[in-house]
């Protein structure tokens, strides 16, 4: 895993002073590293009968679509308001300073479907907790929330079901 971790570059003071941003674009741009990351994540879920992979806007689409393809599952998009063309289910959630809202098509997941939620990075856990609530309220069975990377010091997994979180890389 160290070879994958080492490809992710640190950008100091982005998006604001005092933050060290984990830039995953370097890993995504390296074909061998991207393939290895997708293979490692997908291997965990082979045989788990995943019906849908939910990708969280925007970088979760990159990981979610690749996983859905490898697992023979459908891909479902969770987006910011006003980006989906049909009827949506909305979920607002608290941020450090204010609120945000996510949307999913109301017909994207059927009751009882086995769902894997994918995103690039687990930080504070607020966004993923909202997505878990959305998927659960639609009647889906949550298999797991999977992440390419996790910033452990932010304790984001404390906001998620304890046995339903997997992060490939930990910082």
From Swiss-Prot:
E.C. no: 2.4.2.7
GO terms (BP aspect): adenine salvage; AMP salvage; purine ribonucleoside salvage
Gene Ontology cellular component list: cytoplasm
Keywords: Cytoplasm, Glycosyltransferase, Purine salvage, Transferase
Chief localisation class: cytoplasm
Compartment(s) where it occurs, according to its Swiss-Prot or TrEMBL record: Cytoplasm
Pathway info: Purine metabolism; AMP biosynthesis via salvage pathway; AMP from adenine: step 1/1
Recorded superkingdom: Bacteria
CDD domains: PRTases_typeI
Reactions catalysed, as given in the entry: AMP + diphosphate = 5-phospho-alpha-D-ribose 1-diphosphate + adenine
Molecular function in Gene Ontology: adenine binding; adenine phosphoribosyltransferase activity; AMP binding
Main EC class the enzyme belongs to: transferase
Assigned protein family: Belongs to the purine/pyrimidine phosphoribosyltransferase family.
PANTHER family, A to Z: ADENINE PHOSPHORIBOSYLTRANSFERASE (PTHR32315:SF3)
Subunit note: Homodimer.
HAMAP family associated with the record: Aden_phosphoribosyltr (MF_00004)
Role played: Catalyzes a salvage reaction resulting in the formation of AMP, that is energically less costly than de novo synthesis.
The protein's name: Adenine phosphoribosyltransferase
Species in which this protein is naturally found: Geotalea uraniireducens (strain Rf4) (Geobacter uraniireducens)
């Amino acid at each position: 895993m160290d070879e994958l971790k080492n490809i992710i570059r640190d950008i100091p003071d982005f998006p604001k002073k005092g933050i060290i941003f984990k830039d995953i674009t370097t890993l995504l741009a390296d074909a061998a590293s991207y393939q290895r990351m997708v293979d490692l994540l997908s291997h965990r879920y082979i045989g788990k009968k995943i019906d849908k992979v939910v990708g969280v806007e925007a970088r979760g689409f990159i990981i979610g679509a690749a996983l859905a393809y490898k697992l023979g599952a459908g891909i479902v998009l969770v987006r910011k308001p006003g980006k989906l063309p049909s009827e949506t289910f909305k979920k607002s959630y608290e941020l450090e300073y204010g609120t945000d809202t996510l949307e999913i098509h109301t017909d994207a997941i059927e009751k009882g479907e086995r769902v894997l939620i994918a995103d690039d990075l687990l930080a504070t856990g607020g966004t993923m907790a909202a997505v878990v609530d959305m998927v659960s309220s639609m009647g889906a069975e949550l298999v797991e929330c999977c992440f390419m990377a996790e910033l452990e010091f932010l304790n984001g997994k404390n906001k998620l079901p304890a046995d339903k979180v997997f992060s490939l890389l930990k910082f």
